[in-house]
Amino acid sequence: MTKRIALLTAAAFSALALAATVSVPASAESGKMMKSSGDTVMVGGAPMYPSKTIVENAAKSKDHTTLVAAVKAAGLVKTLDGKGPFTVFAPTNMAFDKLPAGTVETLIKPENKAQLTKILTYHVVPGKLEAADLTDGKKLKTVEGETLTVKRMGDQVTLIDAKGGSSTVTIPNVNQSNGVIHVIDTVLMPS
């Protein structure tokens, strides 16, 4: 009996220690995150290390395989691996799945590289903007050249694109060595 209690106590402390090192959403609806020491955040089942670049971290996320494939197809790896700083609004695989059937397959074809590049660079803003910098009504000029509009209600940040579509930040402030990623739930579209 004493061994069983000792074993259960040890297991409980191990679980608490593990929980203290992993970031998990405090609320999927609010987008709030609990951060661990060092600001390492879990995204797509992988730790996002602040010492790594945007590309290095995104490549480890199971939730961003479509985005990484698109960045490669557009020839943007070297740019997003560069010094920056950049703020990247990173759509998940599920965000890409919301697009009409065949859209991603069409965009990653070599003959559509210019359109793909336009869409991807519309998700990038020069400089490092934390969630606290994304104030209601703020206009963000993207690398693509058009703007995104921030809508904010409490801690929830939503971006409005050039076509009037909206995308919610689900995981904010994923710090990188060359900027910050904010995970979003819908692909943003330029005009």
Residue ranges with predicted function:
Residues 2-5, 27-191:
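Mature, structured domains of secreted/extracytosolic soluble proteins
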Residues 14-15, 29:
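Short N-terminal signal/transit or membrane-insertion segments
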Residues 16-25:
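C-terminal segment of classical bacterial N-terminal signal peptides
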Residues 1-13:
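Bacterial N-terminal signal peptides that target proteins for export
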